[in-house]
């Protein structure tokens, strides 16, 4: 394996290690500092430019490998078509198949490295988003279930009063708005109960 493909393999090993760290079921108190530690070097503009250059170089290697596999296939077909000397053809065929094997290996190596790069970047984004949502949830004041029920009862009474006024004054628009507010309050209460259950499962 040449030097640049050895470097590509080293990059692939690093990406596999980072993806494994992100995918492991680590508790939140350890996951956040570990994720920030892994993400810290990539915040530098110099590192970002270097990564883009390396990815561009790997992409060129990937395209070159595809072109090489295609040309070797054509050469293999031509060598199979011409069967003048059996011993020479067999020896040439082994050499061509060997070059095809190495070209396919390099193509798979560069291709999976590019694919795993995008997977790791997307996984980083999802983990950071999850940690941010957890921080927002923990920073928000807890809402008691009694307060939620009280708000629901107040909204229901307001809707009932609005229905009475609708019959008396024909204010349909006000009645529809209060009904929408009641539906939104019910949805908020349902989401809060769901988030509390999820938080209990996480902790």
Curated annotation (Swiss-Prot):
<feature type="region of interest" description="Disordered">
    <location>
        <begin position="142"/>
        <end position="171"/>
    </location>
</feature>
<dbReference type="GO" id="GO:0006886">
    <property type="term" value="P:intracellular protein transport"/>
</dbReference>
<feature type="topological domain" description="Lumenal">
    <location>
        <begin position="67"/>
        <end position="110"/>
    </location>
</feature>
<dbReference type="Pfam" id="PF05529">
    <property type="entry name" value="Bap31"/>
</dbReference>
<feature type="topological domain" description="Cytoplasmic">
    <location>
        <begin position="28"/>
        <end position="45"/>
    </location>
</feature>
<dbReference type="GO" id="GO:0006888">
    <property type="term" value="P:endoplasmic reticulum to Golgi vesicle-mediated transport"/>
</dbReference>
<comment type="similarity">
    <text>Belongs to the BCAP29/BCAP31 family.</text>
</comment>
<keyword id="KW-0813">Transport</keyword>
<feature type="transmembrane region" description="Helical">
    <location>
        <begin position="7"/>
        <end position="27"/>
    </location>
</feature>
<keyword id="KW-0256">Endoplasmic reticulum</keyword>
<keyword id="KW-0472">Membrane</keyword>
<feature type="transmembrane region" description="Helical">
    <location>
        <begin position="111"/>
        <end position="131"/>
    </location>
</feature>
<protein>
    <recommendedName>
        <fullName>Endoplasmic reticulum transmembrane protein 3</fullName>
    </recommendedName>
</protein>
<keyword id="KW-1133">Transmembrane helix</keyword>
<dbReference type="GO" id="GO:0005789">
    <property type="term" value="C:endoplasmic reticulum membrane"/>
</dbReference>
<feature type="transmembrane region" description="Helical">
    <location>
        <begin position="46"/>
        <end position="66"/>
    </location>
</feature>
<dbReference type="InterPro" id="IPR008417">
    <property type="entry name" value="BAP29/BAP31"/>
</dbReference>
<keyword id="KW-0812">Transmembrane</keyword>
<dbReference type="GO" id="GO:0005783">
    <property type="term" value="C:endoplasmic reticulum"/>
</dbReference>
<keyword id="KW-0653">Protein transport</keyword>
<keyword id="KW-0931">ER-Golgi transport</keyword>
<dbReference type="InterPro" id="IPR040463">
    <property type="entry name" value="BAP29/BAP31_N"/>
</dbReference>
<feature type="topological domain" description="Lumenal">
    <location>
        <begin position="1"/>
        <end position="6"/>
    </location>
</feature>
<dbReference type="GO" id="GO:0070973">
    <property type="term" value="P:protein localization to endoplasmic reticulum exit site"/>
</dbReference>
<feature type="topological domain" description="Cytoplasmic">
    <location>
        <begin position="132"/>
        <end position="203"/>
    </location>
</feature>
<comment type="function">
    <text>May play a role in anterograde transport of membrane proteins from the endoplasmic reticulum to the Golgi. May be involved in invertase secretion.</text>
</comment>
């Amino acid at each position: 394996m040449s030097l640049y493909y050895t470097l590509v393999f080293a990059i692939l090993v690093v990406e596999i290690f980072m993806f494994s760290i992100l995918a492991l079921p680590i508790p939140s108190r350890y996951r956040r500092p570990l994720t920030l530690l892994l993400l810290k070097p990539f915040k530098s503009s110099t590192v970002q430019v270097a990564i883009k250059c390396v990815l561009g170089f790997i992409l060129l290697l990937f395209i070159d490998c595809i072109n090489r596999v295609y040309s070797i296939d054509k050469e293999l077909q031509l060598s199979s078509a011409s069967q003048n000397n059996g011993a020479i053809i067999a020896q040439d065929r082994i050499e061509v198949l060997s070059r095809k094997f190495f070209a396919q290996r390099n193509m798979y190596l560069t291709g999976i490295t590019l694919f795993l790069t995008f997977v790791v970047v997307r996984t980083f984004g999802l983990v950071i988003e999850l940690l941010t949502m957890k921080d927002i949830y923990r920073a928000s004041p807890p809402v008691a279930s009694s307060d939620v029920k009280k708000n629901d009862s107040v909204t229901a009474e307001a809707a009932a009063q609005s229905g009475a006024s609708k019959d008396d004054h024909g204010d349909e628009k006000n009645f529809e708005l209060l009904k929408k507010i009641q539906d939104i309050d019910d949805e908020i209460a349902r989401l809060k109960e769901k988030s509390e259950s999820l938080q209990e499962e996480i902790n």
